């Protein structure tokens, strides 16, 4: 079975995916970064923590996973890791939380 590549989405498309695919929004930033605000409905799993690769096994591999970080670097790596672990529908937010917020999209402070 071919592995689907991670698809990078801009904030507009990320919003549509979040609403239409009812995906799980995964925030892979640190707890310190999360204090400054999150995208509504996100769950946090810090990509830099050693147990990250164990924690993702708790997630449903058939569910749509929408990943974001601060600027898009860690979310890309986290998304690749999800795909390697058999997740089928993985997307990440290009430009991360900063681009999302600066583009005027809603955040939970």
Feature map (PLM): residue ranges:
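Rhodanese-like catalytic fold shared by cysteine-dependent sulfurtransferases
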Residues: 1-23, 31-64, 73-109
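Short, surface-exposed ligand- or partner-binding patches at beta-edge/loop junctions that are enriched
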Residues: 68
């Amino acid at each position: 079975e071919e592995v689907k590549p991670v698809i990078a989405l801009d904030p507009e498309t990320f919003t549509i995916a979040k609403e239409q695919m009812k995906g799980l929004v995964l925030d892979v930033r640190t707890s310190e970064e999360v204090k400054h605000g999150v995208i509504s409905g996100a769950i946090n799993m810090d990509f830099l923590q050693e147990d990250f690769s164990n924690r993702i096994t708790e997630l449903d591999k058939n569910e749509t996973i929408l990943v974001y970080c601060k600027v898009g670097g860690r979310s890309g790596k986290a998304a690749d890791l999800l795909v390697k672990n058999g997740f089928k529908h993985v997307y990440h937010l290009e430009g991360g939380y900063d681009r999302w917020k600066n583009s005027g999209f809603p955040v939970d402070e």
